[in-house]
Curated annotation (Swiss-Prot):
Phylogenetic lineage: Eukaryota, Metazoa, Chordata, Craniata, Vertebrata
Membrane spanning residue stretches: none
Free-text function comment from the UniProt entry: Non-catalytic subunit of the V1 complex of vacuolar(H+)-ATPase (V-ATPase), a multisubunit enzyme composed of a peripheral complex (V1) that hydrolyzes ATP and a membrane integral complex (V0) that translocates protons. V-ATPase is responsible for acidifying and maintaining the pH of intracellular compartments and in some cell types, is targeted to the plasma membrane, where it is responsible for acidifying the extracellular environment.
Subunit structure: V-ATPase is a heteromultimeric enzyme made up of two complexes: the ATP-hydrolytic V1 complex and the proton translocation V0 complex. The V1 complex consists of three catalytic AB heterodimers that form a heterohexamer, three peripheral stalks each consisting of EG heterodimers, one central rotor including subunits D and F, and the regulatory subunits C and H. The proton translocation complex V0 consists of the proton transport subunit a, a ring of proteolipid subunits c9c'', rotary subunit d, subunits e and f, and the accessory subunits ATP6AP1/Ac45 and ATP6AP2/PRR.
Main localization category: membrane
Protein name: V-type proton ATPase subunit B, brain isoform
UniProt record, GO biological process: ATP metabolic process; proton transmembrane transport; regulation of macroautophagy; synaptic vesicle lumen acidification; vacuolar acidification
Length: 511
């Protein structure tokens, strides 16, 4: 019987085992089938048939059974090992994308081993407090992570029916965000920035100060025990990486942070897997360890440019500005890995940072990102030039999930009305400022002068704050009311009369 079973496995067919009818043997057939099925894969074959190298791609010929997305190990003539992934299969040809770059690859002497498996990353709770390179290898002189599991870096698709709508507001301590663009736990909201603006400082401040405004209680929860940060850097300079690392160390949160660093001098192609490694780690921490994970991805512009480089090397038809036509889909595979899942306490909140080339919000990268994500935080150069920190322009900023994360029982019942009125007054103030530049201050009405006064005080008192100033959402709303008292009650048309009568009087700040 044993010999027949062995012959069955060798001949490529699972052995015929008797179906167990009960007792401890239940599942023996399934187990035997699973074991034999795993070892029925093709043997690992090594090839020395590199027919060409093009940019980050290696083209192999005479390959037996190549599979899409299969991992390939390359051994260079000097013994250096690199890894890649099959991007394209055509008959016996295979196009392999090499993560560490193709410099030094000798077409005649490089051997390529096909593993028959997809790209998996080892994950463990011990990854917190560690620093990895863009390929997931430790670079902090610590030991290799003892994996609790090996997960596919593309992630597991979440059943839309099992997603929970984000309803718990995260208090960031930044008035422009908490008061007017509130972030919910499980949301994906990017920071639209540009070269030279303090987007890193804003992201670090959010990491330092983020806490939960508890539902049904006006109490801020600063409990840190189940909070984790996963930080992925793509194509950033050493200064940015050091800034984040030292900031996490200084505020004592490094033990709850996992860093993936692909620096500017690292291979471009590696940037394509760095965010996926980070998100796979975040999914493990959120859904297996039930932690609330904040994922920061910087800089998504570098990621998109790496995507364009691979696309150009494959000679695909380019889309807008040379970016591939599938960039929207590709970005969605990253951004849509945020959220909450029914039956699990953990959550993933994503804050991708992208630098808009030439400050252009119509550029394909911010344009497509804005379609996928639930709003954006817009960092403005004009505010930055006037020494206002954080230079967040609230007019183009947006949080699509704000409406469900604020209000009575979550923040305060006047939150939505105050936010709407501040938006309206600031927008009118901007119009008046533009008109003043044309007609002069003498031609303005008394109402116009009130809007101008509001504009200046709003930018100086509400938007501007210190990098270590942590305002509660209630302090933010009280500052908002102080500014709205510049106007007589009759001009505050966005706020219901009942809310006005409760909060407009001077002593209402005690609420």
């Amino acid at each position: 019987m044993a010999l027949r079973a062995m012959r069955g496995i060798v001949n490529g067919a699972a052995p015929e085992l008797p179906v167990p009818t009960g007792g401890p043997a239940v599942g023996a057939r399934e187990q035997a089938l699973a074991v034999s099925r795993n070892y029925l894969s093709q043997p690992r074959l090594t090839y020395k048939t590199v027919s060409g190298v093009n940019g980050p791609l290696v083209i192999l010929d005479h390959v037996k059974f190549p599979r899409y997305a299969e991992i390939v190990h390359l051994t260079l003539p000097d013994g250096t090992k690199r890894s890649g992934q099959v991007l394209e299969v055509s008959g016996s040809k295979a196009v392999v994308q090499v993560f560490e770059g193709t410099s030094g690859i000798d077409a005649k002497k490089t051997s390529c081993e096909f593993t028959g498996d997809i790209l998996r990353t080892p994950v463990s709770e011990d990854m917190l407090g560690r620093v990895f390179n863009g390929s997931g290898k430790p670079i902090d002189r610590g030991p290799v992570v003892l994996a609790e599991d090996f997960l596919d870096i593309m992630g597991q698709p979440i059943n839309p029916q099992c997603r929970i709508y984000p309803e718990e507001m995260i208090q960031t301590g930044i008035s422009a965000i908490d008061g007017m663009n509130s972030i919910a736990r499980g949301q994906k909201i990017p920071i639209f920035s540009a070269a030279g603006l303090p987007h890193n400082e804003i992201a670090a401040q959010i990491c330092r100060q983020a806490g939960l405004v508890k539902k049904s209680k006006d109490v801020v929860d600063y409990s840190e025990e189940n909070f984790a940060i996963v930080f992925a850097a793509m194509g950033v300079n050493m200064e940015t990486a050091r800034f984040f690392k030292s900031d996490f160390e200084e505020n004592g949160s490094m033990d709850n942070v996992c860093l993936f660093l692909n620096l500017a001098n690292d291979p471009t192609i590696e940037r394509i897997i760095t965010p996926r490694l980070a998100l796979t780690t975040a999914e493990f921490l959120a859904y297996q360890c039930e932690k609330h994970v904040l994922v920061i991805l910087t800089d998504m512009s570098s990621y998109a440019e790496a995507l364009r480089e691979v696309s150009a090397a494959r000679e695909e038809v380019p889309g807008r500005r040379g970016f591939p036509g599938y960039m929207y889909t590709d970005l969605a595979t990253i951004y849509e890995r945020a959220g909450r899942v029914e039956g699990r306490n953990g959550s993933i909140t994503q804050i991708p940072i992208l630098t808009m080339p030439n400050d252009d919000i119509t550029h394909p990268i911010p344009d497509l990102t804005g379609y996928i994500t639930e709003g954006q935080i817009y960092v403005d150069r004009q505010l930055h030039n006037r020494q206002i920190y954080p230079p967040i322009n609230v007019l183009p900023s947006l949080s699509r999930l704000m409406k469900s994360a604020i209000g009575e029982g979550m923040t305060r019942k006047d939150h939505a009305d105050v936010s709407n009125q501040l938006y309206a007054c600031y927008a009118i103030g901007k119009d008046v400022q533009a008109m003043k530049a044309v007609v002069g201050e003498e031609a303005l009405t008394s109402d116009d002068l009130l809007y101008l006064e509001f504009l200046q005080k709003f930018e100086r008192n509400f938007i501007a704050q210190g990098p270590y100033e942590n305002r509660t959402v209630f302090e933010t709303l009280d500052i908002g009311w102080q500014l709205l008292r510049i106007f007589p009650k009759e001009m505050l048309k966005r706020i219901p009369q009942s809310t006005l009568s409760e909060f407009y009087p001077r002593d209402s700040a005690k609420h």
